[in-house]
Amino acid sequence: MLKRASFVEVNTASLRHNFSAVKSIVPKDAHIMAVVKANAYGVGAIKASEIFLQEGAHYLGVATLDEALELHSHFSKTPILILGYSPNSNASMLIDNDLSAMIFSLEQAEVFSQTALKSQKRLKVHLKIDTGMHRLGLEPNFKSIEIIKKIRALKGLEVEGIFTHLSNADAKIKTHAKNQMKAFNAFLEQLSNQKIEFQYRHAYNSAGILSLCNGNENRFLNLYRPGIMLYGFYPSNGMKETCPTILKNVISLKAQIVQIRSVKKGEFIGYGEHFYTNEETLVGVLALGYADGLMRALGNRIQVAINNQLAPLIGKVCMDQCFVKLNNIQAKEGDEVILFGDKSAKANDASEIAALLNTIPYETISTLSKRLERVYI
C-alpha cells in the first residue's frame, strides 16, 4: 500500500529491453557496467541493479561512496566502481567493502595504498585519463606514463582498469569524440609498448555506444558504461531523431487527486497570485511538489494526463502540492494524474518536460526525490 498519494512508476520490461539494446550494439565479448548513480537516474538503484545484473551486467557504476555502500549491501559479490572523486578519508571504507575507486594522482594513490597495507588488503582502482572533457584525470602523455608506473608499483593497489570520458559524443559531428578516442587509443598503445596492460579499458557512455560502435575507435575497449539509455532516453534530441536503436520509456511521475475544490471567479490559486480564476474553476489538488522533483517552474506551463484527457497544471508548484484545472475534465477524487511518462496515455515524457525547462532529461528524472515511492510494474 502506498504511503503517499504520489509515486514514480517504473516499467521493468522497458528496463530489460533497454539493456538488451545495449547488448545488441556492443561487441559480443564486451563487459557492461550499468551506471546506476543518482538512484539509477531516479528509477531506484536497488531494483534497477537487480534487473541489469539478471540481464548480464558485469559491473555497477556509481558516483559516491554512499551509493556504492547501498548497492554493496545488496550485491556483495558484484564489482562496483565509484566513478566520482573519493576523498582520502574514504579509503578504509572502500577497502573494507571491496569497492573500486577512480584515481587520477600519485598522491592519492599513495594514501590509498598505505591504508590498504595497514589492513593487509589491496584496493582496486581505475585510472582516469583526461582526453578532452577537462574535468578530472591524468593527461595522456609521457609524464603520466611515469606516474602510472609508480602507481602500479604500489603494493596496496590493484590497478584493474583505465578509462576516459567522452564529452560530446552525442553531437551530430563526431570530430571531438573521435579525437578523444584517438588520444586514448594512442595512450593505450604507448602503455602497451611498455608492457603496461589493464584488465578493463573503457570510454563509451550511452552516446558513445549509440553512435561510435560501428567504427574502429573502440578497438581497445572491453567494458562499456551505458547510463541514460538504460532508462529510455537518448543523450540528445538529435540522436533521438537519427538513431536506429529503439529505447522504451521506463519512468512515469504520477499522483492522485486528493481533493477537488470549486473556486469562484476572481480568486487566486496558490502562492503569489500566479493564477487568476477568470471563471468558476474546478481545482484538483495533488500531493506532489517541487520537493519531490516536480520543478516549480512548470506551474502554468504544462498539461497533465487524467483519464486520457489533458488538463493544465495551474499556479506555482508548492513544495509538497500542486494544482490542476479540471473544467471540462471527467475526473474525481482519487483519480490518477500522469505528470510525465508514457506518451500512450497522452502525457508528456521527461524529455519534453526537460526541453520546456531548457535542460536535459537526465536532470528531470534524476532529481525525483527518494521520498516518492517507486512502484515497479
Swiss-Prot record:
Catalytic residues in the record: K37, Y271
EC code(s) of this entry: 5.1.1.1
Modified residues (N6-(pyridoxal phosphate)lysine): K37
Keyword list, A-Z: Isomerase, Pyridoxal phosphate
UniProt GO cellular component terms: cytosol
GO biological process, alphabetically ordered: D-alanine biosynthetic process
Pfam families assigned to the protein according to its UniProt record, in alphabetical order: Ala_racemase_C, Ala_racemase_N
Cofactor or coenzyme needed: pyridoxal 5'-phosphate
Superkingdom field: Bacteria
UniProt pathway: Amino-acid biosynthesis; D-alanine biosynthesis; D-alanine from L-alanine: step 1/1
Top enzyme category: isomerase
Record SMART domains: Ala_racemase_C (SM01005)
UniProt-listed PANTHER family: ALANINE RACEMASE, ALANINE RACEMASE, CATABOLIC-RELATED
Record family assignment: Belongs to the alanine racemase family.
Function: Catalyzes the interconversion of L-alanine and D-alanine. May also act on other amino acids.
Protein's name in the database: Alanine racemase
Gene giving rise to this polypeptide: alr
